[in-house]
Amino acid sequence: MAAQKVKKTRRRKERKNVEHGAAHIQSTFNNSIVTLTDAKGNALAWASAGGLGFKGSRKSTPFAAQMAAETAAKAAMEHGLKSVEVYVKGPGAGREAAIRSLQAAGLEVTLIKDVTPIPHNGCRPPKRRRV
């Protein structure tokens, strides 16, 4: 007897009704990742510069961060998101561009906070580059 195929049904994304949430922008020297969450921290939508097709050194540009923020904002606004608190982490070039893009997409920014981890003289940093 031939084995019957089990048909997998993909779970449909349920539309959450969240009006206020948080936007976490991680901007490194190599990439920018924007995650939009609800008040508890559960992710509603996210996007990264690399995931949008930017490769190599173009991932670290402010334009790539702007596009990532715009894409994530549009996806989160489908869940009813209207206002966000922005938490920025990292030293990358796309920090300000991503914040401006969230505002331009129609989200009201209520708070901007820098949460970049700063060591109290922890690990030894990598050696200086000589170019």
From Swiss-Prot:
One of its GO terms (biological process) is translation. InterPro entries: Ribosomal_uS11, Ribosomal_uS11_bac-type, Ribosomal_uS11_CS, Ribosomal_uS11_sf. Residues 1-23 are annotated as: Disordered. Residues 1-15 have a biased composition (Basic residues). Transmembrane segments: none annotated. Keywords: Ribonucleoprotein, Ribosomal protein, RNA-binding, rRNA-binding. One of its GO terms (cellular component) is ribosome. GO terms for molecular function: rRNA binding; structural constituent of ribosome. The keyword Ribonucleoprotein applies. PANTHER family: 40S RIBOSOMAL PROTEIN S14/30S RIBOSOMAL PROTEIN S11. Part of the 30S ribosomal subunit. Interacts with proteins S7 and S18. Binds to IF-3. Belongs to the universal ribosomal protein uS11 family. This is Small ribosomal subunit protein uS11. The gene is rpsK.
